[in-house]
A protein has these predicted regions:
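N-terminal helix-turn-helix DNA-binding module of bacterial transcription factors
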Residues: 1-27, 176, 304
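Bacterial carbohydrate/catabolite-sensing allosteric modules
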Residues: 9-10, 50-60, 102-110, 114-306
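Serine-centered coil/turn micro-motif
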Residues: 15, 43, 95, 162-166, ...
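Alpha-helical recognition/docking segments in bacterial nutrient-uptake
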Residues: 16, 23-135, 139, 207
Length: 306
């Protein structure tokens, strides 16, 4: 008590950083950006995930640190991150980054990653979602289809590969197989997850001798880029070509025509991942290690029946 009274008389203000150091806490959690900053923050899906995480951080009095790759290496960024825990996107258990986090004794949760006993995760059923939206495209009469993947490896990926692009590709192929179609490599293009690259992909599709009747993209922002490329070329959507996306970002219902898509609740993914991480930081038991949340197929004007 005497020490406290003396400190008050002297106008001493406790240093919160020193207190945090004594508790071995930084009062910050990190979110590993899936791409470099300029790409990640252009992606509305990623921004909604960040929004969901940020709301939970505010509730617990923590800051949120966005961690981009350091010298193009996300592993190096994790080695030096001053955080109490990490949320990642698309992480698989065999990645080097997992061993780095385990060595640092950092709790972590992955969004859109591979479910594993060692790695808490928040996902939707990506394969089934893509099966259902491709079935919708096929039921609309489309057979000349181009898929826009987010991974070079998705077309030839083994069945055991549980990355999101590969699970989505399996869903598309399964729906096509039901009607006797086999996906050809020439039908698959690869895009960065940006609108600019979506425009590039759209122009590449339009330059083909035989134009597809429908483009199915693994990302709304890429699908919207394709629509813009078509409009710039004077084509009508969906009269000249249908376009389908994935994510249900806000822009998908603002563009004309509105985009047919898969609604996955990005903000809720971020919220659930952050809540799970705080339970781990506080040494509490998780109610569920792997959380799978619902999705919805939303048909809008960008898909036309033939």
């Amino acid at each position: 008590q005497q020490i406290l009274e003396t400190a008050e008389k002297l106008g001493y203000i406790p240093d919160p950083m020193a207190r945090n150091f004594s508790l071995r806490r930084h009062l910050s959690i990190g979110f590993l950006l899936p791409q470099m900053v300029q790409f990640s923050l252009q992606n509305p899906y990623t921004l909604q995930v960040i929004f969901g995480i940020g709301n939970v951080c505010e509730k617990y009095g923590y800051t949120l640190t966005l961690i981009p790759p350091l010298h193009k290496s996300i592993t190096e960024a994790v080695r030096s991150a001053a955080v109490d825990g990490l949320i990642t996107m698309g992480m698989q258990v065999e990645m080097e980054i997992v061993s780095v986090m385990q060595t640092r004794l950092l709790p972590y949760v992955t969004i859109d990653g591979t479910p594993d006993a060692q790695m808490p995760s928040v996902n939707i059923d990506d394969e089934q979602a893509c099966f259902e939206i491709m079935r919708l495209v096929l039921e609309a009469g489309h057979r000349d289809i181009v898929l826009v993947s987010l991974s070079e490896d998705a077309f030839a990926s083994p069945a055991k590969d549980q990355s999101v692009p590969n699970k989505r590709m399996r869903g598309y192929r399964r729906a096509m197989a039901e009607v006797g179609l086999e996906l050809q490599k020439s039908q698959v293009l690869v895009s960065e997850c940006t609108m600019e690259d979506g425009i590039r992909i759209g122009k590449e599709i339009l330059a083909r001798k035989i134009r597809p009747t429908c483009v199915v993209a693994m990302s709304d922002i890429v699908a919207i880029g394709c629509i813009l490329a078509c409009k710039q070329a004077g084509l009508g959507i969906p009269d000249d070509m249908s376009v389908v996306g994935f994510d249900n970002i806000d822009e998908s219902s603002c563009i004309m025509p509105q985009l047919t898509t898969v609604d996955q609740p990005a903000k809720e993914k971020g919220r659930l991942a952050a809540e799970a991480l705080f339970r781990m930081i506080n040494k509490e038991t998780l109610e569920s290690v792997h959380m799978e949340i619902p999705y919805r197929i939303i048909r809008r004007e960008s898909l036309k029946s033939r």
